[in-house]
Amino acid sequence: MSFVTENPWLMVLTIFIINVCYVTFLTMRTILTLKGYRYIAASVSFLEVLVYIVGLGLVMSNLDHIQNIIAYAFGFSIGIIVGMKIEEKLALGYTVVNVTSAEYELDLPNELRNLGYGVTHYAAFGRDGSRMVMQILTPRKYERKLMDTIKNLDPKAFIIAYEPRNIHGGFWTKGIRRRKLKDYEPEELESVVEHEIQSK
């Protein structure tokens, strides 16, 4: 440890890395707690405190130089970004996608059901007349694929996505057809839908 304290630039690097790790765990733990993943959040908090105890003493005792302070602040900001990126990659939980479309003849609900999504749809009325509204629940890791699919089927559709707090009953308790969602690509919609219709 004395080797680190005697080398100014190595100290800068150490402070930066320790703070990135600490704040990454802190950010992930906060997000996981808000999403309701209590036990995973508790495990992450263990690592967070471990880094805090082992590393922060070194960090705080060497903030007497401007470069160390800058490294500490920069590591903090990078740690937040890294933590959020990791959570995005994990894509925990589900997303509700609400779609409003004027194109009844496209039969979007059945097109999406053929691809493995659970769709609830109903008629609604706006300023310009009748519209079809669809509510679709999907795992977060398939959110982008779903939105690309909808845009390919109906480029003018109005789409809103948000995260539900609690889920109970319905299509999802019976088991989502994840294999279908995983296997297709939005660019290959026509052939996939034709295959599903023919197989029925």
Swiss-Prot record:
TM region positions: 8-28, 40-60, 66-86
Lipoprotein found in the keyword field: no
Record's protein name: UPF0316 protein SAOUHSC_02131
Membrane topology listed for this record: Multi-pass membrane protein
Taxonomic path: Bacteria, Bacillati, Bacillota, Bacilli, Bacillales
Pfam families to which the protein is assigned, alphabetical: DUF2179, DUF5698
A GO CC term attached to the entry: plasma membrane
Source taxon at top rank: Bacteria
CDD domains per the UniProt record, alphabetical: YitT_C_like_1
